[in-house]
Amino acid sequence: MSFLRKKINDVIIESVEISRATFKEAEDFKKLLNQDIDGGYLKIIVDLSNCTFMDSTFLSTIVTALKKVNKIGGNLKLVGVHSETQALLELTGTIKVFEIYETKDEALKSFTVQSISK
């Protein structure tokens, strides 16, 4: 299993359960994220704790989902970003568009804080 989906209240957590996320897995992950967004989930966490490498195609899939969910008032946050992925985010400039958290709990709490402050 490459991906694991968990629902906590109105938040979806998509965990990438492979060490190397590449173009080979990007299409399947894109389908999952689109299912989440099309299903009405506006709060998405992508957990990369088990993923030590990501290529630009896989990153593009996540950026596209972020843009899609942002357009309808939602957000997508990253958790557990490893150093190689961090370097890719910095190199591509996409680090500026993501909220990144160390843990799922921190990301979940950030959604709660956003809801209260709106």
Residue ranges of model-derived segments:
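Charged, low-complexity, helix/coiled-coil-prone segments
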Residues: 1-13, 45-57, 68-69, 108-112
